[in-house]
Amino acid sequence: MSDSAFVNGGREVSSLPLSAQMPGMASAADWVTLLKPRVMSLVVFTGLIGMLVAPGSLHPVLGAIAILCIAVATGASGAINMWYDRDIDAVMRRTKNRPIPAGRIEPGEALGYGIVLAVGSVLVMWLATNVVAAAVLAFAIFFYSVIYTMWLKRSTPQNIVIGGAAGAFPPVIGWAAVTGTIDLMPVMMFAIVFFWTPPHFWSLSLWAQMDYERAGVPMLPVVAGARKTRQHIMAYTVLLSVIAVLPWALGDTGRVYGLSAVVLSLGFLVQSWRVLRDKQDEVGLSLTKDAPARAAFKYSLIYLAVLFLALAVDRFV
């Protein structure tokens, strides 16, 4: 590796080669970290729900392989993301100890790792299920790794809005793995995750604003300010609440899901309202250390998990 510095927006981030910053051999845990297992768990869950609510059936072994392919593809995208974002990861407090900026894994190794896993996951999905599921999986990898990571993330404060599509594909993939088609129901599941993503990540970005600003990432709080971000969180939560009840309103689900969607959405609206009404200084910065934003972020995780679980329960009761 050369001694040249990483540069982000013309600003020097580090003048030392990565291996000199923290020399050492990578552990198995480092290679797992590249796969972003926390993100993977939620993606695998929504993909599994997509399979469970789909009409028809898939052999349990093939179903397990399909879920594994979704997990591996998600991990591959995470590895490619960490390879590309190694410069900004090095200056953000919550990411500076990741394997690449910490010097435990070489960038080229991470990229190769991600590409091999990506290609392998798509090929195995094709062989185990069908071409539709494999094609959507391939596009999801491309969307996250290229469109979001390499283009949107550093170019627009709407990066999360558009890039949220990448995380919304798994239930569609799960459905397609069983049916070989894409119908209205998986599209609505896609829409739920798509509109859930902005309030989820903007809540995080409010209390991690300084990190994003230091790294030069144009997240909405950095570009438009905290006050505008709170307004956007509220607006997208309203949209999400409407979309979440659509499967019930259109008769595609029963009361279990419908009541769950209503109650959970009311809870999310309350959380977002608290974010909107958070005590602020004259420039819109929180006087409570963004406690409401932290609470909304945590609630959003519960919201999506329970909502999708209700879809599966509703299917079998």
From Swiss-Prot:
Keywords: Cell inner membrane, Cell membrane, Heme biosynthesis, Membrane, Transferase, Transmembrane, Transmembrane helix. Carbon 2 of the heme B porphyrin ring is defined according to the Fischer nomenclature. It is found in: Cell inner membrane. Pathway: Porphyrin-containing compound metabolism; heme O biosynthesis; heme O from protoheme: step 1/1. Belongs to the UbiA prenyltransferase family. Protoheme IX farnesyltransferase subfamily. It catalyses: heme b + (2E,6E)-farnesyl diphosphate + H2O = Fe(II)-heme o + diphosphate. It comes from Granulibacter bethesdensis (strain ATCC BAA-1260 / CGDNIH1). GO terms for molecular function: protoheme IX farnesyltransferase activity. Converts heme B (protoheme IX) to heme O by substitution of the vinyl group on carbon 2 of heme B porphyrin ring with a hydroxyethyl farnesyl side group. The chain crosses the membrane at residues 39-58, 62-84, 100-120, 123-143, 160-180, 184-204, 233-253, 256-276, 293-313. InterPro entries: Protohaem_IX_farnesylTrfase, UbiA_prenyltransferase, UbiA_prenylTrfase_CS, UbiA_sf. It is an enzyme of class 2 (transferase). It comes from the Bacteria. NCBIfam families: cyoE_ctaB (TIGR01473), PRK04375.1-2 (NF003349). The gene is ctaB. Its EC number is 2.5.1.141. GO terms for biological process: heme O biosynthetic process. Its main location: membrane. It holds the Pfam family UbiA. GO terms for cellular component: plasma membrane. It is a multi-pass membrane protein. This is Protoheme IX farnesyltransferase.
